[in-house]
């Protein structure tokens, strides 16, 4: 798998990868790079807002603001926000791994077999790391 220069490509806003193009050509890589970067930026923005909420709730809790019900609600909100932050951290790790695969020329290819994952699958799930068949087999074994 060869590294391809995708960072300097400006795509038309209506561009979508096509089967007629060479698989993981620079335009396709630029497309997925932009999608993944946008997802990462949105998550980082949302995560910062959640962390600010947690800080505020912790501040209120430590200051003893509100009655027992308010404090219980604050504690529940802190717990829920921390769980959500944990999930977003996991998602960020997957996005960063996908961006790294783009960088090293492995994006779009199965981490198991090296086979093409396929444009249709990547369009639906840009974080996919396996072919549909491999994913189904993985899910069966997991049960």
Task: Walk through the language-model features, giving the residues of each.
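Residues immediately within or flanking Cys/His clusters that coordinate Zn2+
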Residues: 89, 107, 128
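Interaction interfaces in information-processing and related assembly proteins
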Residues: 1-104
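Cysteine-rich micro-motifs
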Residues: 128-135
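Cys/His-coordinated zinc-binding microdomains
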Residues: 36, 114, 135
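Short Fe-S-cluster ligation motifs
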Residues: 136-143
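Short Cys/His-rich "knuckle" micro-motifs
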Residues: 120-125
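Short functional micro-motifs and their immediate structural scaffolds
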Residues: 100, 117-118, 139
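Short cysteine-rich clusters marking metal-coordination/redox-active sites
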Residues: 110-114, 131
């Amino acid at each position: 798998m060869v590294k391809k220069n995708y960072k300097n490509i400006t795509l038309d806003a209506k561009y979508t990868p096509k089967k007629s193009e060479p698989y993981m050509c620079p335009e396709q890589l630029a497309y997925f790079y932009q999608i993944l970067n946008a997802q990462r930026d949105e998550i980082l923005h949302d995560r910062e807002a959640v962390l600010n909420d947690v800080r505020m709730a912790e501040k209120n809790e430590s200051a003893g603001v509100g009655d027992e019900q308010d404090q219980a609600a604050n504690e529940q909100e802190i717990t829920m926000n921390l769980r959500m932050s944990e999930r977003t951290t996991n998602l960020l790790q997957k996005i960063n791994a996908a961006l790294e695969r783009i960088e090293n020329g492995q994006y779009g290819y199965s981490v198991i077999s090296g086979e093409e994952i396929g444009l249709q699958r990547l369009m639906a799930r840009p974080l996919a790391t396996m072919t549909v068949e491999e994913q189904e087999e993985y899910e069966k074994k997991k049960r």
